[in-house]
Amino acid sequence: MQTPSVFMRKTAKYQIRETIITVIADEPYHPVCLDTIYRVRGELEAFIARDPYFQSTLEPYECPADAPDVVRRMCAATAKAGVGPMAAVAGTIGCMAVEAMAAAGAKYALVDNGGDIALVNDEPVVVGIYAGESPIKGLGLEIPPRDTILGVCTSSATVGPSISFGNSDAALVISDDVSLADAAATALGNRIVDVASLATAFDFLKEIPEVTGAVGIIGDKMATYGRLPKIVRAHVDYEKITKGD
């Protein structure tokens, strides 16, 4: 009887031009991830060269029939969330990388693309919630084992370089559609402008059934929406957050 191969799980940070990611997967799947990101980025860059408006618009973009898959996914997700297509770029690239690793045989694969996480996990994993200078710290979501990809995406007006029209310390959205989780997190963050807005910021998600849960944090206040994984205590190490150096 042949003994199954045993691989060492590897955590590594990579930068591919503007894409800065952390990858957690068995070591043989890391090249699969990187090859996919190079390919997908190339397709996206070629499309942007053809129509620079795609990169700059903050409104949903009408997708041409001949657009590559990465562009089609971004357009579909952001049309539902009411934001520009680049609001879904990180989640879409991360998802396509995890899809490729899973297709190659990975049972556990996670890509954190600047706070937008795509994962498939054959064991429980805790995803930390980082809300910058907010006093709400040390919390995470315990994701149970699953054999399909999940998106856990976070937008913030106070952490990182992403555009936000709100003031949230964290706007987190969960969906099986990672592109949609990314787009909806941006849209949620835009709506969290003050503590009072937490009461209504989630209302638009009622029209997006693919979103299963969300968290909004501003200052010392937190609100939740939908069905969330178990919220647990977690040590959120700032140095492990995917970001530029």
UniProtKB/Swiss-Prot annotation:
Coiled coil: none
Xref: InterPro entries: ApbE-like_sf, MA1715-like, UPF0280
Gene3D superfamilies: ApbE-like domains
Family label: Belongs to the UPF0280 family.
NCBIfam families documented for this protein: PRK04334.1-4
HAMAP family documented for this protein: UPF0280 (MF_01079)
Protein name as catalogued: UPF0280 protein UNCMA_16740
Organism of this sequence: Methanocella arvoryzae (strain DSM 22066 / NBRC 105507 / MRE50)
Lineage: Archaea, Methanobacteriati, Methanobacteriota, Stenosarchaea group, Methanomicrobia
